[in-house]
Amino acid sequence: MKYLKTFIAIIILFALLPTASFASEKSNGNNEDVYAQRMELYKTIETVTMVPWYYIAAVDQYERNIRGIRRDLPKPESISGVYFEPMKWSGPLNPNQDDNNPMSIALFNGVGIDGNGDGKASRTDDFDVLLTMAKYLQSYGSDDDNLKIGLWNYYKRDKTVSIIVEIAKLYNHFGRLDLMAHSFPVPLRSRHSYRNTWGDARGWGGRRIHEGTDIFADYGVPVMATCYGVVEMKGWNRYGGWRVGIRDINNTYHYYAHLSGFAKDLKVGQIVVPGTVIGGVGSSGYGPPGTSGKFPPHLHYGMYKDNGYTEWSFDPYPHLRLWERQMRNKR
């Protein structure tokens, strides 16, 4: 009976949305068109399942992110980013791993659902895929705590759950999906210099490589967030001194180290935008809390990518050059 009610609700929604286009083919439009199509999908599925659209969007964005960098997953080719392995979609004992028949999929305990009422449960149909994911989450509840439980049971990884929750927090706060803008981490008018130092050798505390770019500037020059994100970490590290970590919607962790101090009232969990002041350039680090002055003042800026299994450093220098150039061109 509950499946019948869901099916009827979907049919009614399609009748009320005569211009809706939930096709799974690649969009030929610009980014604004893609964002609009995704938002339409998320809002429609929210109406059917009562799962908040920003959680659906966050899961979709997270999976799109990891599919873009993982070699063991196919690259996303449609509006949605969620991916189900054939065995999970069709059922582990289903002899037809490309099955799109809802009845046989259900018979073999597959998760695939016919979301748009075309008689097929297709892994390449955006609405089918997103509704399947949303229905899974709905089985745990639609409030924050139960959705977190559902996410953990699906991904079995605390870090993944926290990233998805942070992305959902950003989407909910801003009410939109286009949160890709960036800015340079120090004021353009400041005296600053930097070169590509990612991968250079470092000796203090043992042999290691430099996982970032050093931007030299005067002591106390404001340090700003480079992205839309959530403050994930704030505190002391014997290498980085006073430092801040911010996570954006692309699973990228932005690391700001050797600060002279933090912006007033900056706290973990806070939402920031490009240009939000988070601290000042300093020379803290290389010792116990409060150690400072062992090197010239500079900002150590690092970027780390999470792929669903682990997190690794990548070169931020090209991004810094791009953001600096973009900001200068806007002046």
Residue spans for each PLM region:
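Sec-dependent N-terminal signal peptides of Gram-positive bacterial secreted proteins and lipoproteins
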Residues: 2-25
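Catalytic glycan-binding domains that act on GlcNAc-containing polysaccharides
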Residues: 25-175
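Surface-exposed, glycine-biased beta-strand/turn segments
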Residues: 166-242, 274, 331
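Acidic, glycine-rich catalytic/binding loops that coordinate metals and/or anionic ligands
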Residues: 182, 294-331
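Active-site loop architecture of trypsin-fold serine endopeptidases
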Residues: 205, 281-298
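Short, acidic/hydrophobic/Gly-rich beta-strand patch recurrent on exposed beta strands
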Residues: 213-215, 243-249, 302
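Zn2+-dependent peptidoglycan hydrolase active-site motif and core
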Residues: 226-268, 289-296
